A protein has these predicted regions:
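Short alpha-helix capping/helix-loop boundary micro-motifs
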Residues: 22-26
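C-terminal structural segments of small proteins and small subunits
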Residues: 44-77
Length: 77
């Protein structure tokens, strides 16, 4: 599933970041690499961006950027 499809409280592990992503390097700098555990924390009022907990910090990603990240669902946080 894409990271953008996660709902608040759902968790997963990053498996793939699209090699065509415009922000691939920025995601890596933020610690989002294959094997990273992520939790969808919250939706903004209009649903975009969403907040994700990654490596003891919370980051916001736009839907179009989160769609470039494939995760394996691990359940609820």
């Amino acid at each position: 599933m894409c990271l953008s499809e996660m709902i608040p409280g759902q968790s997963g592990v990053v498996t793939i970041i699209s090699p065509h992503s415009k922000i691939r390097r920025r995601l890596q700098d933020l610690g989002i690499v294959p094997g990273t555990h992520v939790v969808c924390v919250n939706n903004s009022p209009l649903g975009d961006p969403k907040a994700y907990a990654v490596r003891r910090t919370v980051i916001a990603l736009r839907k179009e950027d989160a769609a470039e990240i494939i995760v394996r669902e691990t359940g609820n946080a």
